[in-house]
Amino acid sequence: IMKKAIVERLKGVYHQEWFPETGASFPLRVAFMKDEAVIGLDTSGVSLHKRGYRQLTAKAPITETLAAALILLTPWKKDRILVDPFCGSGTFPIEAAMIAAGIAPGMNRSFLAEDWKDLLPRKYWYYAMDEARERVNTNIETDIQGYDLDGEIVKAARENAKLAGVEQLIHFQQRPVSQLNHPKKY
């Protein structure tokens, strides 16, 4: 219904009877509040919380965006210890490692707008990705640890960290929280 209404409006504005359905797709999002409609162009495609690295998940995974936001709200910095005693599929340790290494959130995914060559030439996406890659530094010292009681989910966390490109920055181990100790104080 929304598509039909938009096309009818465009017909009047551009004095055309027909708009061919060729070229790139431009998905629209429509939200209503009382008597107002807000129309937005979806440039991302898949939701932004899907970073592209998490193939395997635990029963109650936290979204990547929420994990990153919570980490950024803490006093944690890359030179400080970070321990997740219930790491599940590794979202908190992986997001912390990505922050520490300067890996941009969208590095491992694609965006719908990348195919819109007429609006934004692909070279600009390449420039942005090159700039983001230049900021990455995985040759850093970190003390990021993830523990979980479930050995299979620890394997999944390791695999997710590998897919994110930060496996060397995180120590994952199967361990119950009752055995959690560390010589460093946070």
Each model region followed by its residue ranges:
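Sequence-level detector for tyrosine residue identity
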Residues: 14, 53, 124-127, 147, ...
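Short, charged low-complexity intrinsically disordered segments located at boundaries
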Residues: 31-43, 99-102, 123-131, 186
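Local beta-strand N-terminus motif with an aromatic residue
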Residues: 79, 185-186
